[in-house]
Amino acid sequence: MTEHNVRNFNINFGPQHPAAHGVLRLVLELDGEIVERVDPHIGLLHRGTEKLIEAKTYLQAIPYFDRLDYVAPMNQEHAFALAVERLTGTQVPIRGQLIRVLYSEIGRILSHLLNVTTQAMDVGALTPPLWGFEEREKLMVFYERACGARMHAAYFRPGGVHQDLPHQLVEDIGNWIDPFLKTVDDIDELLTGNRIFKQRNVDIGVVSLEDAWAWGFSGVMVRGSGAAWDLRRSQPYECYSDLEFDIPIGKNGDCFDRYLIRMIEMRQSARIMRQCVDRLLGDAKIGPVSSLDGKIVPPKRGEMKRSMEALIHHFKLYTEGYHVPAGEVYAAVEAPKGEFGVYLVSDGTNKPYRCKIRAPGYAHLQAMDFLCRGHQLADVSAVLGSLDIVFGEVDR
């Protein structure tokens, strides 16, 4: 009988692969169809964001955050704005807080819709992406009507938001919620009980809670493993402590649980949006949307036409920028993908001394090897989809 030497087979997954979600390159070591080792190669979208921010004023740094997780841009600006507000001791008026929360939840729905529907597409269901992108298009229009940009908004500024929302826009967002919940039910009906979708996701990429903490997971990745850890509830910021919403948790920690959690979170986000819309049309119908302290937020156009001092303030804020007191602060928000944190070090000048960005996707991607070992090659794209990776924030 002849002896056969069996050696493992190496293949490249990406960077041009449609299921690689951007510019991911995985080097996979396969034993037949079984994955023995996964080696993610990142950095193909590295732009040196953290270094670039050090050469910009605090206001000029905001657009960099839109370009990290470009699926839900405003959630990242939120963390940076919170960090600057904590260092400067700025208070955001309630109408500004409600608008921020409203648009953060729109961002969460944008991200989850993209993730749930493209994950369905990765395992072969082609209808959900078409339905999901129809709703995302409407949300993009709400972004555009608030600030003029569909994606890179630069709308959340330290001190509040850039400009007020028209009443008609708030009403339109309120009218959008119920038809959207119907769409979520349709996607739910198509996928949740679907035999093929279940076979591709149940018991794939299982993470125990201990492993989730050890790998530095956050967001849906820990909630899928059974911990009710959500920064909106555990470390409330803005007016989340006044709003009612539930935190869904899974019990198996597999791809299917994470999918179910994202579906429920979209419904909870719609519930939060409903509360914000009611208050923006009710007790917070009129009022300032950004801090009235003129040292950070530029004066209104009308004031500039009347007062020389306002004009000087405006000129100084947009040329030199404001000086932030020396100190360091960590501000984190519950972004759609997990805990998005900004560690900001100020040396008292008009530019950040250091701005460290803690992207959730980075911690999730490092566990690809741990998650995919022993699974089949076809499951790699299912695991990758359930991690919800966007390369802007991983490579930054």
Swiss-Prot record:
It catalyses: a quinone + NADH + 5 H(+)(in) = a quinol + NAD(+) + 4 H(+)(out). Its main location: membrane. It is a peripheral membrane protein. It is an enzyme of class 7 (translocase). Pfam families: Complex1_49kDa. It comes from the Bacteria. Its EC number is 7.1.1.-. It is found in: Cell inner membrane. One of its GO terms (molecular function) is quinone binding. SUPFAM superfamilies: HydB/Nqo4-like. Keywords: Cell inner membrane, Cell membrane, Membrane, NAD, Quinone, Translocase, Transport, Ubiquinone. GO terms for cellular component: plasma membrane. HAMAP family: NDH1_NuoD. NDH-1 shuttles electrons from NADH, via FMN and iron-sulfur (Fe-S) centers, to quinones in the respiratory chain. The immediate electron acceptor for the enzyme in this species is believed to be ubiquinone. Couples the redox reaction to proton translocation (for every two electrons transferred, four hydrogen ions are translocated across the cytoplasmic membrane), and thus conserves the redox energy in a proton gradient. PANTHER family: NADH DEHYDROGENASE [UBIQUINONE] IRON-SULFUR PROTEIN 2, MITOCHONDRIAL, NADH-UBIQUINONE OXIDOREDUCTASE 49 KDA SUBUNIT. NDH-1 is composed of 14 different subunits. Subunits NuoB, C, D, E, F, and G constitute the peripheral sector of the complex. Belongs to the complex I 49 kDa subunit family. This is NADH-quinone oxidoreductase subunit D 1. It comes from Rhizobium meliloti (strain 1021). The lineage of its organism: Bacteria, Pseudomonadati, Pseudomonadota, Alphaproteobacteria, Hyphomicrobiales. The gene is nuoD1.
